[in-house]
């Protein structure tokens, strides 16, 4: 079906970042924010080449005059026109390829609505004229990237988190748990608690500054209560951050209060279990015979698992929940920020995968619903 000399494109559309590149590469060529920005004000200078919309890094750099929108919320595409702009930007500006010449592997969150993947399929074939495409589940790709076929993946990006138990390469759908708590919620919470310190961040542009503070300074405490006492009694945990205008702000216990939300969602008023308990619940929904393998292969993936200290804390919390003699191993690969993309790159370059592509011909015969038969 697919010529060997044409590299497949791998596009991991996250809620926060798009990771795109060529199958067989060990890292994505293009990583840019999943943002479409539109001007807030009317352009007055003629000949400036002002556009009616900006995508990715360009939108990010002009954020002061734009209204920024993320077309993917909680892993689900909510604005298809903007999404099309992002794909167009990915193919033509970032990768500089003609999409009608390359098969495309796209990724999606587990438990996504069926209509969502149908629409993705339709746009690839009808708007971009792809010769072939495939939609893979993000967490499964992360497990591939870690070199395993069995394990439980905790995947947490910007918009959505999941625990996905996988046995011998098959995701176990009845045990997948989806948690609509991820990086974007942590950023919003950090904005809120910084306001309590007297720093005001409100606009979509300022939210990006807070996201940067989160990525550079936040960490997960091994013992939250103890860390709170340390922060209250000394300034050893305080760090300073310079804002774009030169003003310097200091943050203390916010550094770990922000990420603690992953373990205590009640911080932002959510009634769900924390990520440690969610992993445990997910394992408990699986057959008793395979639980041992899942406990010993708990793989973290996604950018919201990049907080220092998260693996040790998960280990401690899951050990407390699991049976006393159980061996528990949390795997946190250093490249986990991109492990979904890396898994996609591995999958799309396997010789055994080549018959799995949905071809243009199959699409023309069956329509968008073909995606449910060929991608599982």
Curated annotation (Swiss-Prot):
Primary location class: cytoplasm
Subcellular location: Cytoplasm; Cytoplasm, Cytoskeleton
Catalysed reactions, semicolon-separated: ATP + H2O = ADP + phosphate + H(+)
Gene3D superfamilies in the record: 3.30.420.40, Actin, Chain A, domain 4 (3.90.640.10)
InterPro entries, A to Z: Actin (IPR004000), Actin/actin-like_CS (IPR020902), Actin_CS (IPR004001), ATPase_NBD (IPR043129)
A Pfam family annotated for this UniProt entry: Actin
Recorded GO MF terms: ATP binding; hydrolase activity
Protein name stated in the entry: Actin, cytoskeletal 3B
């Amino acid at each position: 079906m697919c010529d060997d000399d044409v590299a497949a494109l791998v596009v991991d559309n996250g809620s926060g970042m798009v990771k795109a590149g060529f199958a067989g590469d060990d890292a994505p060529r293009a990583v840019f924010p999943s943002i479409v920005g539109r001007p807030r004000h009317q352009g007055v200078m003629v000949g400036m080449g002002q556009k009616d919309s900006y995508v990715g890094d360009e939108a990010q750099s002009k954020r002061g005059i734009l209204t920024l929108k993320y077309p993917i919320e909680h892993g689900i595409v909510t604005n298809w026109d903007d999404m099309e702009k992002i794909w167009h930007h990915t193919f033509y500006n970032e990768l500089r390829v003609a999409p009608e010449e390359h098969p495309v592997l796209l990724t999606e969150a587990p438990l996504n609505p069926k209509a969502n993947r149908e629409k993705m399929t339709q746009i690839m074939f009808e708007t971009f004229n792809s010769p072939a495409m495939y939609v893979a589940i993000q967490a499964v790709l992360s497990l591939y990237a870690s070199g395993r076929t069995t394990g439980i993946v905790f995947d947490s990006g910007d918009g959505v988190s999941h625990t996905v138990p996988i046995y011998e390469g098959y995701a176990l759908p009845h045990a997948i748990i989806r948690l609509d708590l991820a990086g974007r919620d942590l950023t919003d919470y950090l904005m809120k608690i910084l306001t309590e310190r007297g720093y005001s961040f409100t606009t979509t542009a300022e939210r990006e500054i807070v996201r940067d503070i989160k990525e550079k300074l936040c960490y997960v405490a091994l013992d939250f209560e103890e860390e709170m006492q340390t922060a209250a009694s000394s300034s050893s945990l305080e760090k300073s951050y310079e804002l774009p205008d030169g003003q310097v702000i200091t943050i203390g216990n916010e550094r770990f209060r922000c990420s603690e939300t992953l373990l205590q969602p009640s911080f932002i008023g959510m009634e769900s279990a924390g990520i440690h308990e969610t992993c445990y619940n997910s394992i408990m929904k699986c057959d008793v015979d395979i639980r041992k393998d899942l406990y010993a292969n708990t793989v973290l993936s996604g950018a919201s698992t990049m907080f220092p200290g998260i693996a040790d804390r998960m280990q401690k919390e899951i050990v407390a929940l699991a049976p006393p003699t159980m061996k528990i191993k949390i795997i946190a690969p250093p490249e986990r920020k991109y492990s979904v993309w890396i898994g996609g790159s591995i999958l799309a370059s396997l010789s055994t995968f080549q018959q799995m592509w949905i071809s243009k011909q199959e699409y023309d015969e069956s329509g968008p619903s073909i995606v449910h038969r060929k991608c599982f």
